[in-house]
UniProtKB/Swiss-Prot annotation:
<dbReference type="Pfam" id="PF14374">
    <property type="entry name" value="Ribos_L4_asso_C"/>
</dbReference>
<feature type="cross-link" description="Glycyl lysine isopeptide (Lys-Gly) (interchain with G-Cter in SUMO2)">
    <location>
        <position position="327"/>
    </location>
</feature>
<keyword id="KW-0597">Phosphoprotein</keyword>
<feature type="modified residue" description="N6-acetyllysine">
    <location>
        <position position="106"/>
    </location>
</feature>
<keyword id="KW-0488">Methylation</keyword>
<dbReference type="InterPro" id="IPR023574">
    <property type="entry name" value="Ribosomal_uL4_dom_sf"/>
</dbReference>
<keyword id="KW-0689">Ribosomal protein</keyword>
<comment type="subunit">
    <text>Component of the large ribosomal subunit. May bind IPO9 with low affinity. Interacts with RBM3.</text>
</comment>
<dbReference type="InterPro" id="IPR013000">
    <property type="entry name" value="Ribosomal_uL4_euk/arc_CS"/>
</dbReference>
<feature type="modified residue" description="N-acetylalanine">
    <location>
        <position position="2"/>
    </location>
</feature>
<keyword id="KW-1017">Isopeptide bond</keyword>
<keyword id="KW-0832">Ubl conjugation</keyword>
<feature type="modified residue" description="N6-acetyllysine">
    <location>
        <position position="333"/>
    </location>
</feature>
<keyword id="KW-0687">Ribonucleoprotein</keyword>
<comment type="function">
    <text>Component of the large ribosomal subunit. The ribosome is a large ribonucleoprotein complex responsible for the synthesis of proteins in the cell.</text>
</comment>
<feature type="modified residue" description="Phosphoserine">
    <location>
        <position position="290"/>
    </location>
</feature>
<protein>
    <recommendedName>
        <fullName>Large ribosomal subunit protein uL4</fullName>
    </recommendedName>
</protein>
Length: 421
């Protein structure tokens, strides 16, 4: 399978190259922006929604009134009457059985979304650019292993087909019938409530046929499941990128393929069929940075490489870090030492002054002066001080004289206790 080329071969209805070539339109080289495609698809798809809402009377078609406080039950309105299970049950609230929903839906919701025209065109250009990349088309699930070329262009004679068998024969000759067989094999029952809402069956997407004029081509291809037919002048992003995912398999007619340059422009020439529009530009024309940096011609366009390494220095607080402070102010060490000495000197002066005042006061009362007591550290609780060993005369005086030991008397035995016979 060939890749995207500047010249695209045109294939006949027999599946062979007709010998004619078509220049690849510039729109196939447009920037690929899946984010824009997804955004535009999401917003345009919202325009097909049908308004819905619950009834305004739902949950309120009963007579209920709150019992008030003092009954040890919630203050929710309760159904009146008796003789039935319903009486006394809560009503109206969204937490009650049979009550209304929270924030009932209204039909005046903002259902539709407006999308900028330029943004819609950008999305279509990106979706068209993906049609020429086999990897993206295959990742979407299309069976294009045997397709001769992408984009696949056929002669304009196909636009005059009116019979289904002619369309089947063409798809088989172009090796695109495998994609239709995939659709047949994927038909299955929908999971969920959609089965009850006229959406019973689902299936995969098949190829998209893009034509210029309808001379019967719609009747020929419309019977096959999964096939979508689009006019090249009315391309739809919902059909080109189903689900907001780029890469759908498309088959073009020759006249439709040639018309793309007039519809979207070529960068050098604006679009002739649109007013004041040209293709979006790429952010980078060449993404190979190594090639750009090593380009020999015109090196002045590039800034000279920065060879000097600027290392970030961790700034430490000199008020907390003495080493950094000494770098900034070497005299700081001397200042600190002088401050400590001055504080010690002042403390000594205060103590001497207090001692002198106490001595003068004691002399007035006739009591010899005492030195002022200093603060002692807190005593530890539960710790006994070890006793100092007593040495010298005190030790001899404190020792008690040993009592004279008497010889131990022997206790009489049982035989001695017996009286002599």
């Amino acid at each position: 399978m060939a890749c995207a080329r500047p010249l695209i071969s045109v294939y006949s209805e027999k599946g062979e190259s007709s010998g004619k070539n078509v220049t690849l339109p510039a729109v196939f080289k447009a920037p690929i922006r899946p984010d824009i495609v997804n955004f535009v698809h999401t917003n345009l798809r919202k325009n097909n929604r049908q308004p819905y809402a619950v009834s305004e009377l739902a949950g309120h078609q009963t007579s209920a009134e709150s019992w008030g406080t003092g009954r040890a039950v919630a203050r929710i309105p309760r159904v009146r009457g008796g003789g039935t299970h319903r009486s006394g049950q809560g009503a109206f609230g969204n937490m009650c059985r049979g009550g209304r929903m929270f924030a009932p839906t209204k039909t005046w919701r903002r259902w539709h979304r407006r999308v900028n025209t330029t943004q819609k065109r950008y999305a279509i250009c990106s979706a068209l650019a993906c049609l020429s990349l086999p990897a993206l088309v295959m990742s979407k699930g299309h069976r294009i292993e045997e397709v001769p070329e992408l984009p696949l262009v056929v002669e304009d004679k196909v636009e005059g087909y009116k019979k289904t068998k002619e369309a089947v024969l063409l798809l088989k000759k172009l090796k695109a019938w495998n994609d239709i067989k995939k659709v047949y094999a994927s038909q299955r029952m929908r999971a969920g409530k959609g089965k009850m809402r006229n959406r019973r069956r689902i299936q995969r997407r098949g190829p998209c046929i893009i034509y210029n004029e309808d001379n019967g081509i719609i009747k020929a291809f419309r019977k096959h499941p999964g096939i979508t037919l689009l006019n090249v002048s009315k391309l739809n992003i919902l059909k080109l990128a189903p689900g907001g995912h780029v890469g759908r398999f498309c088959i073009w007619t020759e006249s439709a393929f040639r018309k793309l340059d007039d519809l979207y422009g070529t960068w050098r020439k604006a679009a002739s069929l649109k007013s004041n529009y040209n293709l979006p530009m790429h952010k980078m024309l060449n993404t190979d940075l190594s090639r750009i940096l090593k380009m020999p011609r015109d090196p002045r366009a590039l800034r000279a490489p920065r060879k000097k390494i600027h290392r970030r220095v961790l700034k430490k607080n000199p008020l907390k870090n003495l080493r950094i402070m000494l770098k900034l102010n070497p005299y700081a060490k001397t200042m600190r030492r002088n401050t400590i000495l001055r504080q010690a000197k002042n403390h000594k002066l205060r103590m001497d002054k207090a001692a002198a005042a106490l001595e003068a006061k004691s002399e007035e009362k006739g009591v010899p002066g005492k030195k002022p007591r200093r603060k002692k550290g807190k005593k530890t609780v539960g710790v006994k001080k070890p006793k100092k060993p007593v040495v010298g005369k005190k030790a001899a005086a404190t020792k008690k004289p040993a009592a004279d030991k008497k010889p131990a008397e022997k206790k009489p035995t049982t035989e001695e206790k017996k009286p002599a016979a």
